[in-house]
Amino acid sequence: MSSIRKTYVLKLYVAGNTPNSVRALRTLNHILETEFQGVYALKVIDVLKNPQLAEEDKILATPTLAKVLPPPVRKIIGDLSDRERVLIGLDLLYEELSDGIMEY
């Protein structure tokens, strides 16, 4: 197994400092620190302050989480509280499981 680890680049689009935005960020930080310690970069974008970024990335609802790298780009819209749903939606759960496979 290779010792080189991928770096995951993620963007979280929120609309202000609402309870949903705060909860999404807290949950996402927990998932990232638990599953991807030190191999991720997260950028939080407030679409109320930066509507042009939301428009460029075709964000229609918040919260939206986008995995930019490694390709392909994946997006999850809405509730981010379910760890498994987030990992599957971003196409990350399979890689996590395959890393733990042991050969006998």
Swiss-Prot record:
NCBIfam families: circ_KaiB, PRK09301.1
InterPro entries: Circ_KaiB, KaiB-like, KaiB_domain, Thioredoxin-like_sf
SMART domains, sorted: KaiB
Keyword flag Cytoplasm: no
Family: Belongs to the KaiB family.
Taxonomic superkingdom: Bacteria
One Pfam entry name: KaiB
Domain-related comment: Has 2 forms, fold switches to a thioredoxin-like fold (KaiB(fs)) when bound to KaiC.
GO biological process terms, semicolon-separated: circadian rhythm
Keywords assigned by UniProt, alphabetized: Biological rhythms
Matching Gene3D superfamilies: Glutaredoxin (3.40.30.10)
Function: Key component of the KaiABC oscillator complex, which constitutes the main circadian regulator in cyanobacteria. Complex composition changes during the circadian cycle to control KaiC phosphorylation. KaiA stimulates KaiC autophosphorylation, while KaiB sequesters KaiA, leading to KaiC autodephosphorylation. Phospho-Ser-431 KaiC accumulation triggers binding of KaiB to form the KaiB(6):KaiC(6) complex, leading to changes in output regulators CikA and SasA. KaiB switches to a thioredoxin-like fold (KaiB(fs)) when bound to KaiC. A metamorphic protein which reversibly switches between an inactive tetrameric fold and a rare, thioredoxin-like monomeric fold (KaiB(fs)). KaiB(fs) binds phospho-KaiC, KaiA and CikA. KaiA and CikA compete for binding to KaiB(fs), and KaiB(fs) and SasA compete for binding to KaiC, thus the clock oscillator and output signal pathway are tightly coupled.
Subunit comment: The KaiABC complex composition changes during the circadian cycle to control KaiC phosphorylation. Complexes KaiC(6), KaiA(2-4):KaiC(6), KaiB(6):KaiC(6) and KaiC(6):KaiB(6):KaiA(12) are among the most important forms, many form cooperatively. Undergoes a major conformational rearrangment; in the free state forms homotetramers as a dimer of dimers. When bound to the CI domain of KaiC switches to a monomeric thioredoxin-fold (KaiB(fs)). KaiB(fs) binds CikA, leading it to dephosphorylate phospho-RpaA.
CDD domains, A to Z: KaiB_like
Gene that this polypeptide is encoded by: kaiB
This protein's record includes keyword RNA-binding: no
Protein name as annotated: Circadian clock oscillator protein KaiB
